[in-house]
Curated annotation (Swiss-Prot):
The gene is pnp. Involved in mRNA degradation. Catalyzes the phosphorolysis of single-stranded polyribonucleotides processively in the 3'- to 5'-direction. Keywords: Cytoplasm, Magnesium, Metal-binding, Nucleotidyltransferase, RNA-binding, Transferase. InterPro entries: ExoRNase_PH_dom1, ExoRNase_PH_dom2, ExoRNase_PH_dom2_sf, KH_dom, KH_dom_type_1, KH_dom_type_1_sf, NA-bd_OB-fold, PNPase. The keyword Nucleotide-binding does not apply. It holds the Pfam family PNPase. SUPFAM superfamilies: Eukaryotic type KH-domain (KH-domain type I), Nucleic acid-binding proteins, Ribonuclease PH domain 2-like, Ribosomal protein S5 domain 2-like. NCBIfam families: polynuc_phos, PRK11824.1. It comes from Pseudomonas savastanoi pv. phaseolicola (strain 1448A / Race 6). This is Polyribonucleotide nucleotidyltransferase. Component of the RNA degradosome, which is a multiprotein complex involved in RNA processing and mRNA degradation. Its main location: cytoplasm. GO terms for cellular component: cytosol.
Amino acid sequence: MNPVIKKFQFGQSTVTLETGRIARQASGAVLVTVDDDVSVLVTVVGAKQADAGKGFFPLSVHYQEKTYAAGKIPGGFFKREGRPSEKETLTSRLIDRPIRPLFPEGFMNEVQVVCTVVSTSKKIDPDIAAMIGTSAALAISGIPFDGPVGAARVAFHESTGYLLNPTYEQLQASSLDMVVAGTSEAVLMVESEAKELTEDQMLGAVLFAHDEFQVVINAIKELAAEAAKPVWDWQPKPEATALLGAIRAEFGDAISQAYTITVKADRYARLGELKDQVVAKLAVEEGSPSASEVKAAFGEIEYRTVRENIVNGKPRIDGRDTRTVRPLNIEVGVLPKTHGSALFTRGETQALVVATLGTARDAQLLDTLEGEKKDPFMLHYNFPPFSVGECGRMGGAGRREIGHGRLARRSVQAMLPGADVFPYTIRVVSEITESNGSSSMASVCGASLALMDAGVPMKAPVAGIAMGLVKEGEKFAILTDILGDEDHLGDMDFKVAGTSKGVTALQMDIKIKGITEEIMEIALGQALEARLNILGQMNQIIGQSRNELSANAPTMIAMKIDTDKIRDVIGKGGATIRAICEETKASIDIEDDGSIKIFGESKEAAEAARQRVLGITAEAEIGKIYVGKVERIVDFGAFVNILPGKDGLVHISMLSDARVEKVTDILKEGQEVEVLVLDVDNRGRIKLSIKDVAAAKASGV
């Protein structure tokens, strides 16, 4: 086919969509170029046959940043790209979330999306281009897909309002970094971090983005009109109406009764028994439904039962109404040797969160397409299988753990002190020890508590809450503090974190069409009510950061020296600074402007290192008495060391009031003596006196 190209203006940028020139054997391939600057090649391939063995939709999204895109060669021994970076993993999730709900129910053919950044600058993030390219590639692929999807990034300034698709530089001055994706009718996904914006400002940003990315959707429709392949002739399996009716007739009441059991383990055990009974009764002979078909129908009855109960105003699975937060149990300082710790329990969800303080050298080094940079704040989320009472894989963090950790990080980051106020590296680890819904928001609450327990001067405490939605026709119910089952069976996952003043993070994933502005507004208002409730209970345990750092945390001393003294502190080949660190067990970081940060495992170690630095950088003061050591004796006097690297001369005439024939009659090399600084000439030579010390002391020097 001949190449098809569509251009459109999108905010500050010109976007070009091109297909038919590259990767023509893929089901769909689009090259997205932004301002002749950023180029992302997106390919989509769909398997023609479904994998009968899989009980889920096998969609995979791979976003990859090639170093050649920025004119760089990879570091390391092998000199080629390795495993996905955290940024690549997070962007893959960002692309996956809005497209997944748009594939038809029951579609089980494998679909693989690969987004490759092939050219980039240091001006904008390529993620929006990758999202647009994914939507366009799916639209022309022929794969059943209810798109297209548009996407946009939004910034916010108090003076100028909302800004579409900001540059990195513009984001630095922004109070908001939000990515929104959706169809022409509805918003499907929101990912954001903010600096205490109001709920109205956050909702305004979502609606602003939705309006602005309509131009993207229109351009993709125009591209598809010229370049799309025929849509696959795929039909969903007919609904097993008879099987569903049989299960509901005989087991419907028992299933409904099981969902009144409030303890998760007991409820799961009862539902497991019922499922076994259903399979034993209905999947018994040839010609009857298979066990997998019966289990799928049983799951559908579960789905309908829970949703009907909720929209009809019945109590939720654990007996709560729609607005109640589960009971909280909050503890801080639970681990004796850590720098800060908290145990946050909300119902059957529990997070053990630990904060650790380190030196500037402990900051994470990030090698990105934009260049190397250091990150002084890390938040890591771990979800071991025992947290849900299961055996499972143990190992490195998966995509879900990386995503949840980043959401928790975004939630608390805006409330951390600046490096000029608190120059420590901070690492927070959230260990999920129990889980039944909203473990990422438990991590937010626990992180805030652990940081305050460690003495990190937080600007304000932060709490988070997960909201849910069940919508049947015109009836809907918004749920506060959702359980795991409510997340799975509901239509929306809506997580909001913030302080008492405003929102710091908002994440939203919607599985259905037709989420209105009214629903989002109600959800934000209900989330604020819950957040303030949780913050109130957190503040009863610890309402502000401790006045002092933990005794287990390293001590930091900041000082400044003249820039011409830096080389003296470092020494030849780093010998001086290395010796100080080895002898005092402290670490020293020196900046080009003379700023010095000294970190010691104890106050004594840090102070000892500070005194050594002061000794090296100090200047001899005229009229001050020093205790020095005789380094060398000559015929006309003695050289005495009064400061590290600084010797002065005591002339023979300055040794005593009496006449001195030989210097060695008064002094010996290695002897400690008190000397008075008489003068320092313009060449830095120091003139000392021993005989004038007594008079100087008498005068109060």
